[in-house]
Regions:
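Start-transfer (signal-anchor) and selected internal transmembrane alpha helices
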Residues: 1-57, 367-377
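Extracytoplasmic
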Residues: 9, 47-48, 127-130, 163, ...
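Membrane-interface helix-loop-helix junctions at transmembrane boundaries of multi-pass membrane enzymes
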Residues: 32-40, 226-240, 292-317, 326, ...
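Membrane-embedded helix bundles of polyisoprenyl
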Residues: 47-54, 98, 102, 107, ...
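Transmembrane catalytic cores of multi-pass membrane glycosyltransferases
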Residues: 54-59, 65-70, 94-95, 168-169, ...
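Short hydrophobic/aromatic helix or loop-helix immediately within or flanking a transmembrane segment
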Residues: 73-76, 90-113, 203
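Hydrophobic/aromatic-rich transmembrane helices and adjacent perimembrane loops
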Residues: 163, 170, 213, 328-364, ...
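Signature aromatic-anchored transmembrane alpha helix within multi-pass, membrane-resident enzymes
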Residues: 239-245, 353-397
C-alpha cells in the first residue's frame, strides 16, 4: 500500500514546481485583481456610486424602512407569500418577479423583511444605473467617461431618486429594458433573439408598466418593419415579443379584469384644473430643470427606442385630460418612467454644450471649464438636500406635489422624526391586546404592524385609506369588543386625516403619535 501511494505521487521535482506555481498565483492575485478593477473601473463605478447614493437614506433612518410601498405593501405581501396565503391569480396579477426574490429569502432566512428591502433597494438602484451605463456605452457608442457621466447624472436627478424611494418593481423592470435596448437595435442570430425574448418576459414579470414599455418598443420596431415591407423583420419581432405578450395579457387579466377593476377609469367631460395639474403640470414640474439640456441633446441621440419611449409616455400622460374615460393607471407614473430617456437626452445636451463652446477673450475663456463643474455642483447639492433633509424641512421645490413625490427620501409612510415613536407605540399596543382586542390600522401603519407584531396578524384590521370609523365597524363586525388605533394627535395627522374622530381617547402619547382606544 505504501509503495502504491508513493507511485501515485508526482515526482519530487514536479511536486516542488507545483508548489512554487501555487505560491506565485497567490502572490500575483492582487495584481490580477487590480488589472481587472482597472479594466472595469467605469462599470464598477456605475454600479457602486448609485448603490452608495441609495444607501445614504437607509443609513440615516437606521433599522427602519425607506419608502411608502416598501412598508405598506412589499413587506406585508412578502409575509403573505411566504406563508402561502396568496392564491395563483393574485400572484400572477401582482407581476410577481420581485416577490419571487423576497419571499424565498424571507422563508429561508426568517429575517425581518424590512431588512430584505433595505438591502434590495440600493442593489436594485446600482443595477439599474449600471444597465443604463452599459446601454450608453454599447447601444449609443458613448466613450466610457461620457457614459459614466450620463449614468451618474441620471442617478442624482431627483425624479430618478424618487423612483428608487419605493418603486422597486419599476427599477427591476427598467433594468431589463435597458439591457434589452442594444439587442433590439441588433438582434441578429437566434441566441440574441432568445435573450431579448427572455428580457422582455422579465420586464413584464417585474412590473406591468415596464412590461408595457418593453412591448411598445418591440412593437414599434415590428410595425416599422411591416411598413417597409420587411416581413422577415416583422415576423422576427413578433416571435420575440410573443412570450412577453402572453404573460402581460395573463397578468393584466389576473390583476385588473378578474378582480373587476378594469382597464379604464371614468373622467370628467371637461378636464379640471386639478386633473391638468396632476398630469401635464407634474410632467412639466418633474423635468423643468432639464428642458434646456433636453432640447440641445435631442438631436445628438438618434436612438429610435428612446424617442418611442418618450413619445409613448408623454402621450399616455396626456390621456389624463381626455373626456369621459382614461387609463386606470395614474398619469404621474408614466411621467416618472419618462425619466431615463429624458436624462439621457439631457446628458447628451450637456456634453454638446461643453464641447461646442468656443472661448473668446476675457471672461469667456474660462466658460467651458465652468459649465460642467457648476452643473455638477448644483446637481449634487440638490440631490443631497432631497436625500438627507427631513420631510418637515424639505426645500420648497420638493413640496409642490406631496401626494405624488415624497418631500424627502428619509421617510416612508411616516416622517423620520416619528419612526422610533411608532415602534414604541406598537410595542405598547402588543402588551394591551388580548383575544377580544383588535388593532385597526390605516394603510400607512398596517405594514409596520405586520412587520413588528407578527404574532398579532390575526387581530389586525386594515381599513386602508378610509376613515378610522370604517375600521371600527370592520372590527365590530368581526366580534371584537375592544379596539385600539395608532395615529397622530389632533392637528398633526398625515395623509389627509389631520384629526382623530370623536369616540377615540388617548391611552399613550409619544411625540406627535398616540395610541388610542375606541370608547
Amino acid at each position: 500500500m505504501k509503495g502504491t501511494a508513493r507511485e501515485n505521487r508526482p515526482p519530487r521535482g514536479v511536486e516542488k514546481s507545483m508548489l512554487i506555481s501555487s505560491k506565485e498565483k497567490i502572490r500575483n492575485f492582487p495584481l490580477v485583481l487590480g488589472k481587472l478593477v482597472r479594466s472595469y473601473r467605469f462599470a464598477l463605478a456605475a454600479f457602486l456610486i448609485p448603490l452608495f447614493i441609495r444607501s445614504i437614506p437607509e443609513i440615516l433612518v437606521g433599522p427602519y424602512p425607506v419608502g411608502w410601498d416598501t412598508i405598506a405593501f412589499y413587506v406585508p405581501n412578502t409575509l403573505d407569500w411566504a406563508a402561502g396565503k396568496a392564491g395563483f391569480v393574485q400572484i400572477l396579477g401582482t407581476a410577481p418577479l420581485m416577490y419571487m426574490i423576497s419571499a424565498p429569502v424571507y422563508w429561508v432566512s426568517r429575517v425581518n423583511p424590512v431588512w430584505i428591502f433595505k438591502i434590495m433597494g440600493p442593489i436594485l438602484y446600482g443595477s439599474m444605473i449600471w444597465a443604463l451605463f452599459r446601454f450608453l456605452k454599447i447601444g449609443l457608442k458613448w466613450p466610457d467617461r461620457q457614459a459614466l457621466g450620463g449614468a451618474l447624472l441620471t442617478s442624482l436627478y431627483f425624479v430618478t431618486l424618487r423612483i428608487s424611494w419605493d418603486l422597486y418593481r419599476n427599477m427591476l423592470g427598467l433594468t431589463f429594458i435597458l439591457l434589452s435596448l442594444p439587442l433590439i437595435e441588433d438582434m441578429k442570430g437566434p441566441r440574441k433573439q432568445a435573450l431579448l425574448s427572455v428580457l422582455i418576459v422579465l420586464a413584464v414579470a417585474a412590473d406591468q408598466l415596464t412590461g408595457v414599455i418593453a412591448l411598445v418598443l418591440v412593437g414599434a420596431r415590428a410595425l416599422t418593419g411591416l411598413t417597409r415591407n420587411q416581413r422577415e423583420e416583422f415576423a422576427r419581432m413578433v416571435k420575440v415579443a410573443l412570450p412577453g405578450t402572453v404573460l402581460f395579457v395573463a397578468t393584466a387579466y389576473a390583476g385588473l379584469i378578474a378582480p373587476g377593476i378594469g382597464l379604464v377609469n371614468q373622467q370628467a367631460p371637461v378636464p379640471t384644473l386639478t386633473s391638468a395639474s396632476l398630469s401635464i403640470g407634474f410632467l412639466g414640474y418633474a423635468y423643468l430643470a432639464l428642458i434646456p439640456l433636453i432640447v440641445i441633446g435631442l438631436r445628438k441621440v438618434p436612438n429610435i427606442e428612446l424617442r418611442t419611449w418618450s413619445i409613448f409616455c408623454i402621450a399616455t400622460v396626456a390621456t389624463a385630460i381626455l373626456p369621459f374615460f382614461g387609463p386606470i393607471v395614474q398619469s404621474y407614473r408614466w411621467s416618472l418612467l419618462l425619466d431615463v430617456p429624458l436624462c439621457v437626452f439631457a446628458a447628451a445636451g450637456l456634453y454638446r454644450l461643453v464641447e461646442s463652446v468656443h472661448p473668446g477673450i476675457g471672461w469667456a475663456r474660462n466658460l467651458p471649464r465652468l459649465i460642467l463643474p457648476t452643473f455638477s455642483a448644483v446637481l449634487v447639492i440638490s440631490a443631497t438636500l432631497y436625500i438627507a433633509l427631513p420631510a418637515q424641512q424639505a426645500i420648497v421645490y420638493y413640496t409642490a406635489y406631496p401626494e405624488l413625490l415624497p418631500t424627502s427620501m428619509v421617510q416612508n409612510t411616516i416622517p423620520l422624526s416619528d419612526l422610533g415613536n411608532l415602534r414604541s407605540l406598537l410595542d405598547s399596543a402588543a402588551g394591551r391586546i388580548n383575544s377580544g382586542t383588535a388593532l385597526i390600522t390605516h394603510q400607512a401603519i398596517y405594514g409596520w404592524a405586520r412587520a413588528y407584531l407578527p404574532s398579532l396578524n390575526n387581530q389586525l384590521i386594515n381599513y386602508r385609506y378610509n376613515a378610522p370609523l370604517t375600521g371600527v365597524e370592520m372590527a365590530k363586525s368581526e366580534g371584537y369588543s375592544s379596539i385600539l388605533m395608532i395615529w397622530w394627535i389632533d392637528g398633526s395627522g398625515w395623509h389627509n386625516q389631520p384629526n382623530v374622530p370623536s369616540g377615540f381617547s388617548v391611552l399613550l402619547q409619544i411625540g406627535d403619535l398616540a395610541l388610542y382606544t375606541y370608547n
